[in-house]
Swiss-Prot record:
This is Transcription initiation factor TFIID subunit 9. It is found in: Nucleus. TFIID is a multimeric protein complex that plays a central role in mediating promoter responses to various activators and repressors. The keyword Nucleus applies. CDD domains: HFD_TAF9. Residues 200-210, 241-259 have a biased composition (Gly residues). GO terms for molecular function: protein heterodimerization activity; transcription coactivator activity; transcription coactivator binding. The C-terminus is important for mediating interaction with e(y)2. It comes from Drosophila melanogaster. One of its GO terms (biological process) is transcription initiation at RNA polymerase II promoter. GO terms for cellular component: nucleus; SAGA complex; transcription factor TFIID complex. Residues 269-278 have a biased composition (Acidic residues).
Length: 278
């Protein structure tokens, strides 16, 4: 009996040194028939209750300020408690509410299944059969950065073209030439001839005769220079040649021959001048 009295005295002494909030937690655990628990459980429950009550009071203060109240009212605390319960302590809906939602959902018919469809699989992004890798080439081309390309001079190498039948010949690069055609001037020579008839008196027994002479005026004729606009140089020479002057002989009078002008056209080839442009 003395031992039991001493244990009760120790327990009562320990309870006196425990804070009032901790005593409330211990009494709640005792009512729930929780006999064995660690001492730190009480401290954890105290922290939880302190945080919960603080949040409730802060929300109640916000509601009171919104209603322009100077102090927190019981209605503000109840509203804050309901909002916190709906937000923190969520639970399933009531049975009759779930039944109504299920009836509405089941009234909607499912989409028909197409006959040509095979295995019903979700989209590719949700399947594990999709390819999520890429093959890497064994011989990857080397990539040069922009700075390396700018610092290195560029060289152009021309490979000779080899044919299967003929020998290999080096490939030469020929600069492109531009041909400029200059129209050639046309030179025309014009000569004029004059025919003169001179009368001569014969002897006493003979009759009189006439002498025909052909003369060309001008030492070299008239020179005319023209430029052909069609780049085709055609030279035309108009000349007149007189046949030799005949002398009159015999008694009845002599006849003379006159010169006939013949037009000669000669076509000259077109000359081309080549200018090499870089």
């Amino acid at each position: 009996m003395s031992a039991e009295k001493s244990d009760k005295a120790k327990i009562s002494a320990q309870i006196k040194h425990v804070p009032k909030d901790a005593q409330v937690i211990m009494s709640i655990l005792k009512e729930l028939n929780v006999q064995e628990y660690e001492p730190r459980v009480v401290n954890q429950l105290l922290e939880f209750t302190f945080r919960y009550v603080t949040c409730i009071l802060d929300d109640a203060k916000v509601y009171a300020n919104h209603a322009r109240k100077k102090t927190i009212d019981l209605d503000d605390v109840r509203l804050a408690t309901e909002v916190t319960l709906d937000k923190s302590f969520t639970g399933p809906l009531e049975r009759h509410v779930l039944a109504k939602v299920a009836d509405v959902r089941n009234s909607m018919p499912l989409p028909p299944i197409k006959p040509h469809c095979g295995l019903r699989l979700p989209p590719d992004r949700y399947c594990l059969t999709g390819v999520n890798y890429k093959l890497r080439a064994t011989n990857q081309p080397k990539k040069m950065t922009k700075s390396a390309v700018e610092g290195r001079p560029l060289k152009t190498v021309v490979k000779p073209v080899s044919s299967a039948n003929g020998p290999k010949r080096p490939h030469s690069v020929v600069a492109k030439q531009q041909v400029v055609t200059i129209p050639k001037p046309v030179i025309k020579f014009t000569t004029t001839t004059t025919t003169k008839t001179v009368g001569s008196s014969g002897g006493s027994g003979g009759g009189g005769g006439q002498e025909v002479k052909s003369e060309s005026t001008g030492a070299g004729g008239d020179l005319k220079m023209e430029v052909d606009s069609d780049a085709a140089a055609v030279g035309s020479i108009a000349g007149a040649s007189g046949s030799g002057a005949g002398s009159a002989s015999g008694g009845g009078g002599g006849g003379g021959s006159s010169g006939v002008g013949v037009a000669v056209k000669r076509e000259r080839e077109e000359e081309e001048f080549e200018f090499v442009t870089n």
